[in-house]
Amino acid sequence: MSGRAVSNSQHAQQSFGSGPQLYRDVAELHAVPSPSHGALMDPSHFDDFAFAYQGLPDQPSLVSLADHAHAHASQSPTAFPQHQAMSGLAHNGLPFGALPAGNRSQSMDGSDAPPDRTSPASNALEDSTTDEFGLASRSRADATDLGGKPKEDKADATPAWSELKTKAGKERKRLPLACIACRRKKIRCSGEKPACKHCLRSRIPCVYKVTTRKAAPRTDYMAMLDKRLKRMEERIIKVIPKSDQEVASSVTRAVVKPAIPGTVPSNKPTKKRGAEEAFGPDLEAWAKAPSKPKIDGDDRPSSLQVQEAEENKLQHEGTEALPSKEIQEHLAEVFFDNIYGQSYHLLHKPSYMRKLKNGTLPPVLVLTVCAVAARFTSSPLVNSSGPEFLRGEEWASHARDICTRRYEWPNLTILTCLLILGLHEFGTCQGGRSWALGGQAIRMAFALQLHKDLEYDPSGRTGPKKQLSFIDREIRRRIMWACFLMDRFNSSGTDRPMFIREDTIQIPLPVKEKYFQFDMPAPTEMLDGQVPHPASPNDGQLADARENMGVAAFLIRAIALWGRIITYLSQGGKDLDPNPMWEDESQYVKHLNDVVNLEASLPSSLKYSAENLDVHKTENTASQFLFMHICLQHNILFVSRAAMSARKQQGVHDDFFSEASKRTFSAANQISELLREAEQSRCFVSAPFAGYCAFSSTTVHILGVISGNPNMKPTAEANLTTNVKYLHKMKKYWGMFHWMVENVRTQYRNALDAMRAGANLQDRAAQSSFLQYGDWFNRYPHGLSDAEFMDPATHKRKDSGADGVLEAKPELQSVEEYFSTLPTPQSVEHKDTIRAVGTKRKQSAKKQAGLPTQSGQHLESMQGTDADSVSGAQERRFSGGLGLPSNSYNPLAVSNAQNPAFSTAMSPMSPANMTAFSHHAHTPTFFPPELLAMNFGQGANGNIDPLDRQLVFGGYSLDASTGLGGGQDIMSGLDWDAVASGAHPDGGLQGRRSTAKAGMNGQAAGMADGAGLSGPEASSAWFMPFNMEPPEMGQDPGFNMGGIDPFTGVFGGGGSGLATPNALGGLQQQGP
């Protein structure tokens, strides 16, 4: 106590001389006698004084001491009871301003006065602006009221908490825990227990609140967002079905930052948990739980496992529909002999045949090959009563169902089946199916990345990448090029754009066939001529890329060029060309130069010659070799004929048109030469596009026939004979060629009429419309049906479900529309006859099937057959030949008012009705009801006797007395019977001037250059076999009427040039 008093007095002395006010206070103090320093500090004076807090640090400040010149002055001891009473009041909770009057300070003279500055009570309780020395201040000088450490405590001992160590073992510099009062006032707590200095000074309870939860570490804004995102993800995961959880496993999850070290939560549960504690177990269980049961040790993606499971099913699905092993092997040989390499180079024959014998081929591939090859076989095991092009439909239906169910999982097997099925549907006149299958194949090819030349298998299997062999890489390339060719074939129409762009295919062209068969790697060029992987001579490979390309590579280039020509001529390219086609800068001239340069760029081994053809025969590629050259010539024909439409335009040069005409007729003749060479070499060119090339050549030959040029006409007639014969052969295997043959028939008839009318050949060539190869889609969108032969007037329009979102059509009809829908009188007259014929078809069919082959029995059956049964049998036979129901067609229901589009429909007069659909079966003549209702007289005007007419098919001719004109006949000597049958006529025609002119390459065709046929002997004199049913005798159409063309209702137009049916499907030209 004495030490503190001394120090305090010294502090007072230092502060004493700080201002003039202090001198006045000192004078007053000296005026009052005070006890000595020893008497003041004598402990005897404090016997009855009890301190409330012994360690009160600011105790000296409660006692006013004055000392001047080292002399201590103080109040009398009577002041201490006052201080004790003040302390008691303060301790009892009384306010400091409520002190009693007796406790107030008294003046020195004993009278009441205002509190003096020297009174401790006034300093501490009443005057807050002055201290005990009278100095003005805002607060205590030592700041002890704020809990600060007094200045004299610097020498005190360190607090007890400083002796504690941190968890890291270091000395603690910060207070581990502050009391509640210091926290609220936000001041530093001394940390003593049970009460800190501030609480002791303020005389308030000191409470330390100990919590079990540690303060969460501060996190930044992004960490907070991560936690919120994590909580939202957990809520979403709980809603996701278990079947879809394998997809969620591959989704990137939100990442919560790990906790700061040292802040791991305690074991006691709290209200809020950390991210690791809240989500850790659930996330771990969710990540480890399998979505579906997997095979032990199989860690591949579930989608890949599903695809492989489907591929395993593909190895067995369709087994029940397979034919016998013998038929499978036979049809496989037929496929590689007649289909492989013509249009598509699909499948590797050594691998296919080896797998077929081992039974490791997928059944769907075997069904597809059998379906498309069945049309070309002559085996009795595969033969059916229907037409050839419908033989494999049963196998195709099973393969089609299997393929369409697996469009989600693309693989090379399904892709190959789609391409082959597209070709099959092309032959069965299923335009919609072929178009859809081709589009699906193209999408699947791009999904398998076939348009890229990859070295490793891109199927996505886990594990080490499998390097593709040369055969596998070549198979991938050929499948992609097959998709490219199918796109060009199917998209050659006016309204069907092409899907595959040439620049998207970054793969080389196929190698030669012998290299592919014998596994000999060789580099080839790309479509634009670049060599992606050139080989040096030291690599052991054939270094010349152009010499390594065979027929397949240049066939692809020819079809690609044809696609560009189609785009220019038929799909708007010509309209976008700013230059006219006869200018050198035009796109037309560019395409023309490309056509000529492509043929000139052929290697010496691929140029057309007899020697090269023999070489390709030994390699079994002669048909492909001929097909490639047919396509090259067809490009020249197609692009040259387009120039004829520009003859009447302004500024066209005559040389431009004449050169185009020469190239057109030269290319048409070359196509016929190639077809004739294929027939003589017994190399059947079976590609459907080859038939279209023959059709295009035929349209040019028709113009040559009516040209009147004596040098051009014989060649055109001979080539026309070859083309028509080839088209008749092709329509047995591809159904759409019935339509093309009928179109040729119509064009020929119209050309004859135009020539007799005095039309110019050049005008005729410019006005003639050109059929596109892809137009058959619109002709046969869903196969053959009754609508092909139904009278449009009897067809009632019905609302289709596909038009549900379109505008509602008006239900009212005008008078003209109403009368146009009424049936013709002839159809009403023969309505009962139609019903009677329909009921007798089956009986007639049975009767025909049971006809004996002996002549006597045949004559008896002919005499016992009535007209109705014969007519019914003929109708049934035609409908059955087309693969239709027996009641699908009736020629009597067709009226004379035909649709103009009907002129290209397949007519029962088509010669293929006998040769393609049945053996030695007679087809009915397609006469309108008006003609059948007439009863023509059978006068003695030179017509053949009825008995002879029964035996001589086509023995009806026109007489000079009919008055059908006496003009020159363009096809005067063309014997269409010989054209269709392939027979060579052995003599001239009697009763007229005739000659036998040899065709090109020594093939003779009956021709004559005089007037039209006339006289009774003007028929082909071809006698029917005795197992053939005779024609109907009830309505014998004798052509002895003047000025009447009985075929007007058939061909849709008048004219004297007639084309009548004969035994083998030729056009029997007749005229006056």
UniProtKB/Swiss-Prot annotation:
Pfam name, any one:
Zn_clus
- Which species does this protein come from? Fusarium oxysporum f. sp. lycopersici (strain 4287 / CBS 123668 / FGSC 9935 / NRRL 34936) (Fusarium vascular wilt of tomato)
The main place the protein resides is nucleus
Q: Does the keyword ATP-binding apply?
A: no
Which is one Gene Ontology cellular component term of this protein? nucleus
What is this organism's lineage?
Eukaryota, Fungi, Dikarya, Ascomycota, Pezizomycotina
Q: Does the keyword Ubl conjugation apply?
A: no
Q: What else is known?
A: In contrast to the FTF1 gene which is present in multiple copies in highly virulent fusarium oxysporum strains, FTF2 is only present in a single copy.
Q: Give the knockout phenotype.
A: Leads to a reduced ability to colonize the root systema and thus in a reduced virulence.
Alphabetical GO biological process terms: DNA-templated transcription
Q: Which parts of this chain does the entry mark as a DNA-binding region?
A: 179-206
Q: What is this protein called?
A: Zn(2)-C6 fungal-type transcription factor FTF2
- Say which domain of life the source belongs to: Eukaryota
Keywords noted in UniProt: DNA-binding, Metal-binding, Nucleus, Transcription, Transcription regulation, Virulence
Q: For this protein, what is any one GO molecular function term? A: zinc ion binding
